[in-house]
Structures are given as C-alpha cells and as structure tokens.
Curated annotation (Swiss-Prot):
Origin species: Kluyveromyces lactis (strain ATCC 8585 / CBS 2359 / DSM 70799 / NBRC 1267 / NRRL Y-1140 / WM37)
Family assignment from sequence similarity: Belongs to the mitochondrion-specific ribosomal protein mS41 family.
Top-level taxon in the UniProt lineage: Eukaryota
Taxonomic classification: Eukaryota, Fungi, Dikarya, Ascomycota, Saccharomycotina
Keyword Ribosomal protein among UniProt keywords: yes
Protein name: Small ribosomal subunit protein mS41
Coiled coil: none
Gene (UniProt): FYV4
InterPro entries on file: Ribosomal_mS41, SAM_Ribosomal_mS41
Transit peptide per record: 1-23
Length: 125
C-alpha cells in the first residue's frame, strides 16, 4: 500500500503543479528592480532592499522561512509575499494602506464601547 502511494501519479502531478505556480516574472519598465518594487508597494518595505541584495530572483524564490531568517518582521513579510504573488498573477502593484481603528475601537468591542460612551454622555448632562 505504501509502495503504491509513493509511485502514484498524483504525487508527480502535485509536484509539477507547484513548480509551475512559482514562476519568476521578468522586470518591467515600471518595476525594473527590487528596490523599485519595494518602494512601489510602500509600508517602508524599501528598507529591506539590502536584505534582498537587489536581486530579482531572490524576490521570487525566497519564502517566509528565509525572510524570517533574514530578520524581516512578520507583518512586512506577509505583505511583501502577498505583493509578490500579485506581481506573479499580473495584477496591478500599488500600496495598500494599513487599516485604522475607529474612535470606538475594533469591531468586537464596538457595541460595548459605544454603550459606555453614551451612558457617560447621559450622566454628564
């Protein structure tokens, strides 16, 4: 049973499909190098140009564990990898601004916070 599983065609198909998804895109006029890409996506990612050694292949071959070894924080890592995937798919590359909490806090505690605020307003009158 184990022998049959090791040599089944599904394992070969899975390996082939993963390699085809990991294609390297050629630099364009808009984004000629890694520095331009990291500057274009924003969120102070251009600080990591030295980490990538300004090599285009490093941008597409390095994954999360490698970037973690290089000392890139998790939020930046996820953002960069997300933008690299968008570049692979041919989507437009632009900065995605960080979200901002509302005055009343996050969505889980918003109702509670609004109720307390309204109670304080009533008591102040």
């Amino acid at each position: 049973m184990l022998f049959r599983r090791l040599f089944s065609s599904s394992v070969i198909v899975q390996a082939a499909s993963k390699t085809s998804l990991r294609k390297t895109v050629k630099p364009s006029e808009e984004i000629p190098d890694v520095n331009a890409f990291l500057g274009r996506i924003g969120r102070k990612c251009d600080e990591f140009t030295d980490t990538y050694e300004n090599k285009w292949d490093n941008l597409f071959t390095w994954g999360g564990p490698v970037l973690k070894e290089k000392g890139i924080p998790i939020q930046q890592r996820r953002y960069i990898l997300n933008q690299v995937e968008k570049l692979r798919k041919g989507e437009e590359i632009k900065e995605i601004k960080k979200g901002k909490k509302s005055f009343f806090g996050g969505e889980r505690k918003r109702k509670e916070t609004i109720a307390k605020w309204r109670a304080e307003q009533r008591n102040a009158e």
